[in-house]
């Protein structure tokens, strides 16, 4: 396997392990989730550059749009939780339900 792909897969795996390890704090979970989406973006961009199909060239852009949306929703949740409770624990997300 090409070392570039191995490094990107390693970055995704480390972000996934970080997500599983630091799942109590929202900031750490959001950072790990952002690392996972960035490694997926780089992987799809590399695959799109290697295959010269016009249909796959749009996939990195679509993934980047979804990453921006999840970052915006995550930051909105972080702000609402930290303003309400003063902490960024994920178990406070259950308290936001009506």
Curated annotation (Swiss-Prot):
GO molecular function: NADH dehydrogenase (ubiquinone) activity
GO biological process: ATP synthesis coupled electron transport
E.C. numbers: 7.1.1.2
Principal subcellular localization: mitochondrion
Membrane topology listed for this record: Multi-pass membrane protein
Major enzyme class: translocase
Reaction(s) this enzyme catalyzes, per UniProt: a ubiquinone + NADH + 5 H(+)(in) = a ubiquinol + NAD(+) + 4 H(+)(out)
Transmembrane segments: 1-21, 27-47, 61-81
UniProt keyword annotations, A-Z: Electron transport, Membrane, Mitochondrion, Mitochondrion inner membrane, NAD, Respiratory chain, Translocase, Transmembrane, Transmembrane helix, Transport, Ubiquinone
InterPro entries according to UniProt: NADH_UbQ_OxRdtase_chain4L/K (IPR001133), NUOK/Mnh_C1-like (IPR039428)
Record's subcellular location: Mitochondrion inner membrane
Any single Gene Ontology cellular-component annotation: respiratory chain complex I
Oligomer and partners: Core subunit of respiratory chain NADH dehydrogenase (Complex I) which is composed of 45 different subunits.
Protein function: Core subunit of the mitochondrial membrane respiratory chain NADH dehydrogenase (Complex I) which catalyzes electron transfer from NADH through the respiratory chain, using ubiquinone as an electron acceptor. Part of the enzyme membrane arm which is embedded in the lipid bilayer and involved in proton translocation.
UniProt similarity note: Belongs to the complex I subunit 4L family.
Identification of the protein by name: NADH-ubiquinone oxidoreductase chain 4L
Organism in which the protein naturally occurs: Macaca sylvanus
């Amino acid at each position: 396997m090409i070392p570039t792909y191995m490094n990107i897969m390693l970055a995704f795996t480390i972000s996934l392990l970080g997500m599983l390890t630091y799942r109590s704090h929202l900031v750490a979970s959001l950072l790990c989730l952002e690392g996972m989406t960035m490694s997926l973006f780089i992987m799809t961009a590399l695959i799109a550059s290697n295959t010269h199909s016009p249909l796959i060239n749009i996939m990195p852009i679509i993934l980047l749009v979804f990453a921006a949306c999840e970052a915006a929703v995550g930051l909105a949740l972080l702000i609402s939780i930290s303003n309400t409770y003063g902490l960024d624990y994920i178990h406070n997300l259950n308290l936001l339900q009506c």
